[in-house]
Amino acid sequence: MRLFLSLPVLVVVLSIVLEGPAPAQGTPDVSSALDKLKEFGNTLEDKARELISRIKQSELSAKMREWFSETFQKVKEKLKIDS
């Protein structure tokens, strides 16, 4: 009885496997994949440049740069006096 049930299942499985992938499941074209990758890279580059320019122009970063400059000058002056 088991053989009687397993043979049709085996035939169906083999027919599905030997049929190959469906057109929608076929391997994508390499050039389209590279185009998508290039588009993603360009988008990422644009967003990164925009973020960097926002950071450079923000008030917080200007205050931080000023604070670091002042602190660095104070440290330099202390080191000159001590030496």
From Swiss-Prot:
It is found in: Secreted. Its main location: secreted. Gene3D superfamilies: Apolipoprotein C-I. Inhibitor of lipoprotein binding to the low density lipoprotein (LDL) receptor, LDL receptor-related protein, and very low density lipoprotein (VLDL) receptor. Associates with high density lipoproteins (HDL) and the triacylglycerol-rich lipoproteins in the plasma and makes up about 10% of the protein of the VLDL and 2% of that of HDL. Appears to interfere directly with fatty acid uptake and is also the major plasma inhibitor of cholesteryl ester transfer protein (CETP). Binds free fatty acids and reduces their intracellular esterification. This is Apolipoprotein C-I. PANTHER family: APOLIPOPROTEIN C-I. GO terms for molecular function: fatty acid binding; lipase inhibitor activity; phosphatidylcholine binding; phosphatidylcholine-sterol O-acyltransferase activator activity; phospholipase inhibitor activity. One of its GO terms (biological process) is negative regulation of fatty acid biosynthetic process. Synthesized mainly in liver and to a minor degree in intestine. Also found in the lung and spleen. GO terms for cellular component: chylomicron; endoplasmic reticulum; extracellular region; high-density lipoprotein particle; very-low-density lipoprotein particle. Residues 1-26 form the signal peptide. Belongs to the apolipoprotein C1 family. The gene is APOC1. It comes from Homo sapiens (Human). The keyword Ligase does not apply. Apolipoprotein C-I is present in acidic (APOC1A) and basic (APOC1B) forms in P.paniscus, P.abelii and P.troglodytes and perhaps also in baboons and macaques. The two genes for ApoC-I arose through a duplication process that occurred after the divergence of New World monkeys from the human lineage. In human, the acidic form has become a pseudogene sometime between the divergence of bonobos and chimpanzees from the human lineage and the appearance of the Denisovans. Pseudogenization resulted when the codon for the penultimate amino acid in the signal sequence was changed to a stop codon. Keywords: Lipid transport, Secreted, Signal, Transport, VLDL. It comes from the Eukaryota.
